[in-house]
From Swiss-Prot:
This is Acetaldehyde dehydrogenase. Its EC number is 1.2.1.10. Keywords: Aromatic hydrocarbons catabolism, NAD, Oxidoreductase. The active site is at C125. One of its GO terms (biological process) is catabolic process. It comes from the Bacteria. Belongs to the acetaldehyde dehydrogenase family. The keyword Oxidoreductase applies. NAD(+) binds at S156, A157, G158, P159, G160, T161, R162, Q163, N164, N266. One of its GO terms (molecular function) is acetaldehyde dehydrogenase (acetylating) activity.
Amino acid sequence: MKKVKAAIIGPGNIGTDLMYKLLRSNYIEIALMVGIYPQSEGLARARSLGIETSHEGIGAVLREPDIKIVFDATAAKPHLKHAPLLREAGKIAIDLTPAAVGPYMVPVVNIDEHLEADNVNMVTCGGQATVPIVAAINRVAGVRYAEIVASLASKSAGPGTRQNIDEFTETTARALEVVGGAGKGKAIIILNPAEPPIMMHNTIYTLVENPDEELIKSAVFEMVKRIQEYVPGYRLQVEPLVEGNKVTTIIEVTGAGDYLPPYAGNLDIMTSAAARAGELMAMRLLGVYKPERGDSCA
């Protein structure tokens, strides 16, 4: 089967975990992994798997006309520089940084709206874990306000996450509104230093217009099943608890352990969502994409 050639920029934890996921894809071929440090462990791993590598950064990607999709797993500032260069080169950018140059992408909610975009942003780990639940509740109950608390193992939060705490909360809150449909969104992140490290937990509070418990639970259960198609470790820890017009739901995410440890579910859900988005976009380029169940809850 023909595959779409793709590149990964950024051979760190996120980029390396993403690489392992994309190696299983039926529609994407990783043609290149690039970084800026010749001795990078991620580049060495890629080479050991037979993937071409370069330490010349984005320049190496721009020189390859056959590469159609580029996953940017660097940081917000580099992506702001990369985005216009990739656009000019006619390449699709899937942005795993907080830069948010393109529209927010939560595959299970709004893939069809942005399938032909040349740059999409994967929001945040908290966004990928919670926006679908808010969208599901909003569809049947009307969400006036959504507040999420993402608790992550401190060990899973590298320097990039720690430097981007403000961007995390702002981007996640905005995505709760723009993609999830909430009238107002708020996000809080907690880095938990407990040993052994905790799994990623997300508590989702919503205030709704129509607190129909049966409809809300049905919508959430269906959404969880759909997310599990690409994030097997995603599970409903506490099913929707309806108290008046307040609905509380708790989600746990366990990582697949492709490269990162299972407790790093926050990173795993980002790479899983990016791989899912990339694969669906590749299917469109190959002319084989067919919407399933109307991949939009908006």
